[in-house]
């Protein structure tokens, strides 16, 4: 089904009139999933919000989306607190997902089959206390890691949680690092909870090069795991 959906999606998005034309395009761009097709189009600025109609943001209630949180061991109450449910149409086909807002009023969108962004890509910055910025900030790569961290706070995982109150920054992509640096300058303590991969380590290095002693790499807390959400899912 994924293969058929992918070909149909490419035909609609790129005005390919035949299956063979769509397949040739997929091969030329090394696209193998619906997710990759949409991400490639967004990157090329060919798949814009003008092609999305009837965009609606609602309280999160869809059973399959809540089940997705459960499959990632995210506390559903926390998920509902920080996320909304988004519905939209592309070429009259209905899509929906979990929406997480950013500073440019765009939204990161997730469902079990799709990972992307609607609107402008940007960081998300959340105050620990309403209208009151803290001296410390926790930095996450994606919002699922942030939600996983908040779930660990609720579980009172003392090994994992930073004791002092901090604000929260979600990069939503390591490509947003320059934007992030502008906002991190206000903080005296910066705690990096980034992915245990090359991109994550490079991002910590970039932040440390600018803010030096203010930065703590917190990845030792989940050294045997890919990221914060992986720790939550697999910890004993």
Residue ranges and their predicted role:
Residues 10, 69, 141, 149, ...:
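Terminal peptide-recognition signature
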Residues 66-78:
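Serine endopeptidase catalytic core focused on the charge-relay Asp
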Residues 1-68:
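Non-catalytic accessory segments of DNA primases and related replication-initiation nucleases
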Residues 75-93:
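Short, basic/aromatic recognition patches
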